[in-house]
Amino acid sequence: MDKRLLSLGLALAGTAAAAQERPNIVLFLVDDMGVMDTSVPFLTDGKGNPVLYPLNDWYRTPQMERLANQGVRFSQFYAQGVSSPSRTSLLTGQDAARHRVTNWIRSEGNNRDDYGPYDWNWEGLGADDITLPRLLREAGYRTIHVGKGHFAPFGHSGEDPRDLGFEVNVAGSSIGEPGSYLGENGYGLLRGTRSRAVPGLDKYHGTDTFLTEALTLEALAQVDSAVAAKEPFFLYLSHYAVHNPFEIDKRFSAHYQDTTYSQAARGYATLIEGMDKSLGDVMDHLEQLGIAENTLIVFLGDNGSDAPLGGSHDIGSSAPLRGKKGSEFEGGTRVPCIIAWARPDSRNAWQQKYPVLQGAISREIGTIMDIFPTLTLLSGAQAPLPPAHTEDGYLLWSFLRGDKNPWHEDTFLNHFPHQHRGSYFTSWRHGPWKLIYYYNPDHPDYPQCTLFNLEEDPSETHDVLRQHPRIARRLLREMIDRLRRDNATYPVDFEGKPVLPREDAIR
């Protein structure tokens, strides 16, 4: 950590420890990090006990372990399958079928493919949309964006996170990946992919400051500024890591010398550990400022793993889960989520009102849409929303204190009417059952469905549709009803006509 930040933090600590009107919030978002990209075991056995797998031994994330010991981690937490849909869901509390940002957003414009819907929301979020940072800012929070944005294309209002409710924006733009992680390369401006150069970090150009470290330093400086102004803050620290390019973070390369892994896989592992160090730096800084007990941390991945291990649909990058980022399988949408107070203290008034178990695992189904209502309640930013803005998320506070929530549905909709590793599909999970519907827009009269029991077959290796056709038909009806409710957009056939899901697809 920068010694200047440490000195400033110690100077501010004496004035920050007093009780404050509202808690601070740190949303620590990691790009392309799946649930297995960590030494923290998220997956459990039938009794709810954590199970270590080989990937947990490969990655080194001691700070995630530290955070998990302080709070609750979710074994079944879902995000959308690619970046922009998830980030839009995070800021709006709506699922992708409803907000229609159903694919990743290309900076240069509409990236619709041959059978993709004409009316998907390729323009992303805009200045008129209701967003989490906008509500928090209106409630008196200093809203800070540091890192990846990817909310809208170049030239559209949502390109700049400040148009979405953030008071401060550092390094956020329309780009979805960095041109380079290396300060020597100007993060893509001097060398690398210039069209994906990370903006706003010129003072680090030509130095050996890795991008993850630069963003961390900038985030801590912004926290210092908010504390000095005695303002509650919402820090949205959105790392470009661990998205490709899988450049090696030399600070951690000595830990990954096993040549049975490719250079890309070793580079990916260093990106993971660099992200983890950033988390620890943030936690340490909150302690030094004396505000840790008044600060909630939400750690989250934005979609499934893109680790360069195995193929797109096999059990490799997310083992024992199948698939990876952009696929229809669990490895494409299951993400790490840890929620904890930065310093647990049962005497703290905020922690008494919003208790979080320590070292606990929740096996309840949670989704990225749940973050919106959970944080608006905590912050006091709850306000009557316009009827046009319907939330799809539910409060997580019951789960965080170890209780059930009868109002929280055990469902997850993943609607992806585009081409990727998994193409033109909708998946619908309800309880242990998961239905995948393939539209097959090139042959729309022949849709396909598969059914998995995730409790018995979490690796999705056994399609049990023929054994349970009644369950499959019930899930199909539920899925169609949900898509209709959301006014979803669909793939099109070769004539440009929407290909809607068919209730007779399962006979």
Predicted regions and their residues:
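Short, structured active-site-proximal loop/turn typified by the sulfatase FGly-forming signature C/S-X-P-X-R
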Residues: 45-87, 93-97, 142-144, 164-173, ...
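Loop/turn elements at helix/coil->beta-strand transitions in domains of secreted/extracellular proteins
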Residues: 21-26, 69-75, 138-144, 164-167, ...
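Long, internal low-complexity/basic segments
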Residues: 20-23, 30, 35, 73, ...
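Formylglycine-dependent
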Residues: 101-142, 149-231, 239-248, 266-269, ...
